[in-house]
Structures are given as C-alpha cells and as structure tokens.
Amino acid sequence: MSQPMTVQCPTCDTPVEWSAASPSRPFCSERCKLIDLGAWASEEHAIPVSPDAEDEMFSGDLEAPHRGH
C-alpha cells in the first residue's frame, strides 16, 4: 500500500495527511483554518493584481453621468 500524501499546514507548517481522516485539510486543525480566514478578512493576505489590471477592471464604473441639457 502506498504512503498517504501529506501537505504542510499553511498556517503552522505541521504535516497534514491529505485524506478524509483530516477534515480541516490543508490545515492541521480548525484553529489554523480560522487563523487563515482571519488573515484574509483583515487583508493580511491578498491576491496580487497589477495596478493596470485593476484600473481596467473598474474604469467602466467611473464614467461621468449623462446630463441631458
């Protein structure tokens, strides 16, 4: 039988078996899962986006309102 795959907990680096026996995977525990969620909620973690892409994404939202005079 092969060894089960293990991954490192993203919060504390503890080895975690990737199986149904580890319901919080990839985290080692519910505590580490909540610590990570809190970091995303407080914007300690972010997905990098180039400033140009962000400007392009929201440029349509900033159009001046049409005035019918």
Swiss-Prot record:
Residues 47-69 are annotated as: Disordered. The keyword Transcription regulation does not apply. It holds the Pfam family YacG. Zn(2+) binds at C9, C12, C28, C32. Disulfide bonds: none annotated. Keywords: Metal-binding, Zinc. InterPro entries: DNA_gyrase_inhibitor_YacG (IPR005584), Znf_NHR/GATA (IPR013088). One of its GO terms (molecular function) is zinc ion binding. Binds 1 zinc ion. GO terms for biological process: regulation of DNA-templated transcription. Gene3D superfamilies: Erythroid Transcription Factor GATA-1, subunit A (3.30.50.10). NCBIfam families: PRK00418.1. Belongs to the DNA gyrase inhibitor YacG family. Interacts with GyrB. Inhibits all the catalytic activities of DNA gyrase by preventing its interaction with DNA. Acts by binding directly to the C-terminal domain of GyrB, which probably disrupts DNA binding by the gyrase. This is DNA gyrase inhibitor YacG. It comes from Pseudomonas syringae pv. tomato (strain ATCC BAA-871 / DC3000).
